[in-house]
Swiss-Prot record:
One of its GO terms (molecular function) is purine-nucleoside phosphorylase activity. HAMAP family: Nucleos_phosphorylase_PpnP (MF_01537). Its EC number is 2.4.2.1, 2.4.2.2. This is Pyrimidine/purine nucleoside phosphorylase. Belongs to the nucleoside phosphorylase PpnP family. Keywords: Glycosyltransferase, Transferase. It comes from Shigella dysenteriae serotype 1 (strain Sd197). Transmembrane segments: none annotated. The gene is ppnP. Catalyzes the phosphorolysis of diverse nucleosides, yielding D-ribose 1-phosphate and the respective free bases. Can use uridine, adenosine, guanosine, cytidine, thymidine, inosine and xanthosine as substrates. Also catalyzes the reverse reactions. InterPro entries: Ppnp, RmlC-like_jellyroll, RmlC_Cupin_sf.
Length: 94
């Protein structure tokens, strides 16, 4: 079953799903803006198209992740994103 999600007044939209090859995940798109997300469990983020400028928990420097890049976010934490162009992503819940 698919689950639609919308955040930040519609600037971030995702569709949640579960599959045998991916596990529980969501795929989505973010438009330009700055966002802060909280995690309940560890997440693996893959940038599909575009780029994300990311400040991970306990980090002091922002890091750019472009299409094909992967980064991990610990559970029960918060991370910050800067998005300069519409960017698509896959988020796997680990």
């Amino acid at each position: 079953m698919l689950q639609s999600n919308e955040y930040f007044s519609g600037k971030v939209k995702s569709i949640g799903f579960s599959s045998s090859s991916t596990g529980r995940a969501s795929v989505g798109v973010m438009v330009e803006g700055e966002y802060t997300f909280s995690t309940a469990e560890p997440e693996e983020m893959t940038v599909i198209n575009g780029a994300l400028n990311v400040l991970l928990p306990d980090a002091t420097d922002w890091q750019v992740y472009e299409a094909g890049s992967v980064f991990n976010v610990p559970g029960h934490s918060e991370f910050h994103l800067q998005v300069a162009e519409p960017t698509s992503y896959l988020c796997r819940y680990l």
